[in-house]
């Protein structure tokens, strides 16, 4: 699986993901709008990881084939837990995880 990290996704996460990972910066796609970025990413990647929680409201994702994973935070210690799920994404997935509620001890 080939995965693209959006701007804002901590690059150290790539070492924990069992997939080939590139970043928007490395691809020289930093200036693309969300719609252009998703179209370009879909032509070359299987998955897209972002921190943009508004993406699903800003873009029509219904026809997208690329898997999209929205991270709930950029805090590195919390992100390691998401590496397995990112590597296991399937075509067309849209996964948006929330952080666990720290007040809920159950």
List each language-model region with its residue ranges.
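Short secondary-structure boundary segments
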Residues: 7, 51-53, 72
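Short active-site-adjacent structural elements
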Residues: 14, 57-60, 77-79
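N-terminal first-folded block
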Residues: 1-44
